[in-house]
């Protein structure tokens, strides 16, 4: 279960890649914009500010996130991105930090590129930090003798969850798109006692939390904390620097 409040703990940090992604989408007067994986809707509603004449459609697989998005005035619905197909007036498809949860997402991108009209845009961003110390620490624990039998379905057990930017560029260029793809590492300045744990608790650790009863979850956290503290030491001034690599792709279906 997704917790919108936990996810929004670092809303400013999580929001910056969204704006960086959309800054490269040069759609002038789109008729319909679709946000796949809209989360709590705090970023989705900015789409209507930029393109006030567009219909904005939002999807998320979490009922809790959809409820939070609707409370912000977003026309959100519960749905799986695998089931989504563009309507004839869809001009922009946006997906922010969602597609890495779908192993077959390259196939979805090819399908969408074939279904969208010429001139339409596909813009997505996915984390590229699955080999970062934070994720390696989680994977090491998940695969340890203590936890492996309880967490055998952990979705990020391998670091090859997403492709590099060049891989997506090749995929969508071959599908008939003009592609702008890049990677950025954000160095987030976090504060608090256990900020990295709090950050990944709202995303990557969610499957672990869902699989474990409370007492096991507390034990797992206790084992993870020193690993994160060693990888991301807190400075004397209270700041913890958290490098986070992200992969961006903006593709336009050719005329």
From Swiss-Prot:
It is found in: Cytoplasm. InterPro entries: SAM-dependent_MTases_sf, Trans-aconitate_MeTrfase, Trans_acon_MeTrfase_C. GO terms for molecular function: trans-aconitate 2-methyltransferase activity. Coiled coil: none annotated. It catalyses: trans-aconitate + S-adenosyl-L-methionine = (E)-3-(methoxycarbonyl)pent-2-enedioate + S-adenosyl-L-homocysteine. It is an enzyme of class 2 (transferase). It comes from the Bacteria. GO terms for cellular component: cytoplasm. Catalyzes the S-adenosylmethionine monomethyl esterification of trans-aconitate. NCBIfam families: PRK14103.1 (NF010703). This is Trans-aconitate 2-methyltransferase. It comes from Mycolicibacterium gilvum (strain PYR-GCK) (Mycobacterium gilvum (strain PYR-GCK)). The lineage of its organism: Bacteria, Bacillati, Actinomycetota, Actinomycetes, Mycobacteriales.
């Amino acid at each position: 279960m997704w917790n919108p409040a936990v996810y929004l703990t670092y809303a400013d940090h999580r929001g910056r890649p969204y704006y960086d992604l959309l800054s490269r989408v040069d759609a002038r007067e789109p008729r319909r914009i679709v946000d796949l994986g809209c989360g709590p809707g705090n970023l989705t509603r900015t789409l209507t500010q930029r393109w006030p004449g567009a219909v904005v459609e939002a999807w998320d697989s979490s009922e809790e996130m959809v409820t939070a998005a609707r409370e912000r005035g977003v026309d959100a619905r519960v749905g799986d991105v695998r089931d989504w197909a563009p309507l004839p007036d869809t001009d922009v498809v946006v997906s922010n930090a969602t597609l890495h949860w779908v192993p077959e997402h390259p196939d979805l991108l090819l399908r969408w590129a074939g279904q969208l009209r010429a001139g339409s845009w596909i813009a997505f961003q996915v984390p590229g930090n699955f080999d970062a110390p934070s994720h390696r620490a989680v994977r090491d624990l998940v695969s340890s003798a203590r936890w492996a039998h309880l967490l055998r379905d952990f979705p990020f057990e391998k670091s090859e969850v997403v492709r590099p930017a060049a891989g997506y560029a090749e995929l969508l260029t071959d599908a008939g798109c003009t592609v702008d793809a890049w990677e950025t590492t954000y160095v987030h300045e976090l504060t608090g006692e256990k900020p990295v744990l709090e950050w990944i608790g709202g995303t990557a650790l969610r499957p672990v939390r869902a699989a474990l009863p409370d007492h096991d979850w507390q034990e797992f956290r206790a084992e993870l904390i020193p690993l994160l503290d060693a990888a991301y030491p807190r400075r004397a001034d209270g700041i913890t620097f958290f490098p986070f690599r992200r992969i961006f792709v903006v593709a336009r279906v050719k005329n």
